[in-house]
A protein has these predicted regions:
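Folded extracytoplasmic luminal domains of secretory or organellar precursors
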Residues: 1-106
Length: 106
């Protein structure tokens, strides 16, 4: 679920690049920030059985991308409630994945 939501979120951000071509923040959100989010969720899922400690770490750092996106948007004084909501949801999913994988380590 998290991978699918993150991918859809990244697709949405890519449409915003076309609407705001001069925004470095939106470009970073759509590329590096959400690339990291999707890759971390995928990596965490792939490591669940073989390396639960790494899966736990990747679940935690997945939330870094959406948080960075929020900071970048704030620095450019861009207010977009749908992106803020999406970033909050992605951070929440990262927290849930972290807690779930933390439980598996025990």
């Amino acid at each position: 679920m998290a991978i699918e939501k993150a991918t859809k979120g990244q697709d949405y951000l890519k449409t915003l690049i076309k609407e705001f071509p001069s925004s470095h923040a939106i470009k970073n959100c759509a590329t590096s920030d959400y690339d990291g989010l999707v890759m971390s969720f995928r990596s965490s899922l792939g490591e669940l059985v073989v390396d639960p400690i790494s899966a736990n770490y990747d679940a935690r750092v997945a939330g870094d991308g959406p948080q960075a996106c929020d900071r970048e948007l704030a620095n450019e004084k861009i207010v977009n409630p749908s992106v803020s909501k999406m970033n909050n949801e992605m951070t929440f999913l990262s927290d849930v994945a972290y807690l779930a994988t933390n439980y598996l380590r025990k």
